[in-house]
């Protein structure tokens, strides 16, 4: 029997590097503008900081897309979320708050089915992603980006462990989708 070849999982080190670069850019930005802006002014980041924040957000969406590409190529598994849908629903206001809990739940369904016990906790991923978005938009974009990729590291780790298991026997079909 030939080993299972799936598309590769996302390279998360790129996200961590972008997060670290964003934190460094924030520190440089802060040291260049030591005085506080007037409370009526909206702080506008420098171009290099904005580009790092933008590229970090885009790379996060690339990683989400990649997870769902991998899930769609698993033999015997019908993943209910297309890669485009997984990314697209992040842009719908209010619904995206639900979505960051929903797509990890579907990946956890696969992981828990492969282990035949609840190994992956999708609520934890959803809470980490939600906390990362709050951190990213209200407090610190760089640390928020690093927190996003910590959540992705948990997902990748669970998927790697599930892929390392021997193939499932045909008598144990996957659970139906909701």
Task: Say what each PLM segment does.
Residues 134-147:
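Extracellular/periplasmic helix-loop-helix junctions in multi-pass membrane proteins
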Residues 1-45, 52-91, 95-134, 150-178:
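Membrane-interface extramembranous regions at the lipid-water interface
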């Amino acid at each position: 029997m030939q080993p299972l070849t799936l598309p590769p999982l996302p390279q998360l080190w790129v996200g961590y590097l972008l997060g670290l670069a964003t934190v460094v850019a924030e520190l440089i930005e802060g040291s260049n503008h030591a005085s506080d802006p007037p409370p009526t002014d909206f702080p506008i980041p420098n171009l290099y900081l904005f580009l790092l924040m933008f590229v970090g957000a885009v790379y996060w969406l690339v990683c989400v897309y990649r997870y769902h590409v991998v899930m769609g190529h698993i033999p015997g598994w019908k993943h209910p979320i297309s890669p485009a849908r997984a990314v697209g629903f992040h842009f719908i206001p209010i619904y995206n708050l639900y979505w960051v809990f929903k797509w990890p739940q579907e990946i956890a369904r696969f992981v828990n089915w492969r282990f035949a016990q609840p190994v992956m906790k999708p609520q934890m991923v959803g809470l980490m992603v939600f906390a990362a978005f709050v951190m990213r938009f209200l407090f610190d974009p760089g640390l928020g980006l690093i927190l996003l990729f910590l959540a992705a590291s948990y997902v990748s780790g669970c998927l790697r462990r599930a892929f390392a298991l021997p193939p499932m026997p045909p008598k144990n079909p996957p659970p139906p989708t909701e």
